[in-house]
Amino acid sequence: MMRFDPSRRSFLKTSVALAGTSPFLAGLLRAQSHDAGAPLMAYVGTFSSPLQDVLPTQVDLPPGNGRGIHLFQVNRATGAMTPAGEHRMGTSPSCLAVNGAGTRLYSANETDRVNDSGEGSVSAFAVNPADGQLKLLNTVPSGGAGPTYVSLHPEGRFLLVANYFGGSVAVLPILADGRLGEATDVKVDAGTIGPTRATHAPPGSFAFSGHDRTHAHMIQADPSGRFVLHVDLGLDRIYVWRFDEQKGLLIPNDPAGVSLPPGD
């Protein structure tokens, strides 16, 4: 019998696998609006290997059975999705982001380990406009362990990364050919860890996991690109940064963020 894991972490990762294609669809719909004959593609990130460094007090996730990035062609009239192949990766590309032109895709490789510190990685891909297939451009360190979220800065010259197990966020420059450069900035979260159970959330909710250490879980720029926000679910805090678009630096804002009720 399948065991239901009510942790917030497990729920969110399942949701990402099911709904994580929406940024791609939005970008590619804009890019392909002038060419109705071009394929409309959806890409789904998966867990393709177990999380080796999960602490016993942290979430209990089963080994992933995905095979990397799964590709689907979307029927423009009905929305039906037809399998169109897969880009095999054993590093759990669990979160994906595609640029507005639909020509580049970036993946957070959550279970990759690229050096002795256990740092994860992020990969850049070129998207073939004829058939939507992916070609790996390069892979670089993510600035911390367990990269779980990636998003593009509105100007398109930087990729923002949240590293769940490292409790850090990073800024990676996007080079002219779409490849990723080394991080221009890395910030490590610090502070008092919240309680295991939520203060206000009712029993059975998803708000009772991730309070064993810092866990950066999401990072996003505002539409103007002047500010970047990221959340740490271990600290129950939203960080606010001013963004230096010339150097790719995160500068503490005043105020530097907001703390939320513990566990909520």
Residue ranges and their predicted role:
Residues G37, G100-A101, P154-E155, P223-S224:
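Residue-level detector of Asp-centered blade-edge/turn motifs that repeat once per structural unit
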Residues S49-Q52, T111-N115, G166-G167, L235-D236:
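Short glycine/acidic-enriched loop and turn motifs that connect beta-strands
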Residues R3-F4, S10-A31:
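N-terminal export signals
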Residues T82-H87, L136-V140, S205-F208, D254-S259:
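A short beta-strand motif characteristic of beta-propeller blades
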Residues Q73-T78, A126-G132, P173-G181, R242-L249:
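Short loop/turn segments immediately following beta-strands, especially the blade-tip
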Residues Q133-H217:
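Asp-box/WD-like beta-propeller blade repeats and closely related beta-sheet repeat scaffolds
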